């Protein structure tokens, strides 16, 4: 049994765990492992927003342009494509890229082909919305959890490998305790979302500044290779409850501290749906994410179902990754997106702006 925290990230713990040292988890789970050369990763969520079938071809072309840019020097080591319909009826094509270090992502994003595309006046006049939500957690600021050991998705795809069975799972509070930084830091949030350029009500280009310790969760489901019984388990038993919880967070986020929630379906380059999905949730703080997870009926039902079936899972792949960030390691930028998009909804326009 291993700790979820890599040996090179372990230090004397000043904050106590929720379980005793003798705790044994009820079933096996694993985490992504990276060596001490990985200091900080970058997660880039690059979106194209549209409404109506007449805009779909142009939106798909724009998505393909973004993906083509990943082939340039310093492009991400891993990416995937997703689709989301928000509660205003807009469709969003989201290209998600992962970089193993900040410098390569910076070189990529500032290269002339990429920066000129994003900064072009065409982005303001082509009838689509665009956004980029880019965050860069340090190695001690993110955790992963997988019910499988191969072909890790998300940030796991840019790590070196996978752990043995880990100890920190199967109890409330284990998510926090998989963060290396949790050994000595409560990861308390401070500040608020602020609009620092533009006006969401007007449109055009809008930039939102984040605050310390915003939390981002990506929680995924892969039923592509599942047999009939596991497909039924997911589609008939897990998905309805999951969808209910995700819709609640999408529509009632401010009441519980959730800035943005998108339950997305993976797609291919032509926009066809794949049998994979995940949730993208931005939270005002990790403790607010914890409170919702531990108390809301929909999540409690999901958690109970997972506990019941986890040990017998074969080809239904379930996982999550959670991260927090310093304010300086976040960028939220929107072009002609509706004011309820992403971090725009809860961002405050200050007097000095």
UniProtKB/Swiss-Prot annotation:
It is an enzyme of class 4 (lyase). Optimum temperature is 30 degrees Celsius. Optimum pH is 8.0. GO terms for molecular function: lyase activity; metal ion binding. An aliphatic aldoxime binds at residues 219, 320. It catalyses: an aliphatic aldoxime = a nitrile + H2O. Its cofactor is heme b. Heme b binds at residue 299. The active site is at residue 320. Catalyzes the dehydration of aldoximes to their corresponding nitrile. Is active toward various arylalkyl- and alkyl-aldoximes, and to a lesser extent toward aryl-aldoximes. Belongs to the heme-containing dehydratase family. This is Aliphatic aldoxime dehydratase. The gene is oxd.
